[in-house]
Amino acid sequence: MAKNKFNHSWLHDHINDPYVKMAQREGYRARAAYKLKEIDEQDKLIRPGQVIVDLGAAPGSWSQYARNKLADSPRAKDGRIDGAVVAIDLLPMEPVADVTFIQGDFREESVFRELESVVLDASGGNKIDLVLSDMAPNLSGVAFADAARIEYLCDLALEFAQAHLKPEGALLVKCFHGSGYSQIVEKFKRHFKVVAKRKPKASRDKSSETFILGRYLKAVD
């Protein structure tokens, strides 16, 4: 009975969520688009001409938002965007116009090589401007296990960013407050000159979800 009450409560909140309604009106696949939108408006992350990689992209609302920002440029002509968005996820994703999607686990060498190849082609052999990660583990409710899974996914995004970002590039990852949160923030501070924590209004109040932004890579010793 308690589980049914919880499900009915979640469904009621979801149906009446203003961000869900806005996403439906504006054609976004998920309300998560407005989390990125708010952070982008505050921090000016996405600009015309950029090459952007979206890790854990499905169902695709972050890729949609990034694509729309790159399309909103005087240099975006003939239906093309000014820049490139490369998205990857374990799960399938319906195509997003102008977004290159790879389905697979980028921890696997063959998938990682494909991702690198697509990114190099999109960037003209240069490094990239922005890495977005909305990756999240399946949470078990066991605090220490969940903390380890969250930290692991943040580490994957951080390692990818270190290898592929321009020195002036940025990394935005989803995280959750918990026992490993401060360690993740410290890792960002070791690798980026500017680190900020963001909790957009579109994140549900009851959620421990937060976002960590790193900008301007530090030189490797």
From Swiss-Prot:
Binding site for S-adenosyl-L-methionine: G60, W62, D89, D105, D134
Keyword Methyltransferase: yes
Domain of life: Bacteria
Catalysis: reaction(s): uridine(2552) in 23S rRNA + S-adenosyl-L-methionine = 2'-O-methyluridine(2552) in 23S rRNA + S-adenosyl-L-homocysteine + H(+)
Entry GO terms, CC: cytoplasm
Family classification: Belongs to the class I-like SAM-binding methyltransferase superfamily. RNA methyltransferase RlmE family.
Function, as annotated: Specifically methylates the uridine in position 2552 of 23S rRNA at the 2'-O position of the ribose in the fully assembled 50S ribosomal subunit.
Protein's recorded name: Ribosomal RNA large subunit methyltransferase E
Lineage, uppermost ranks: Bacteria, Pseudomonadati, Pseudomonadota, Betaproteobacteria, Burkholderiales
Gene: rlmE
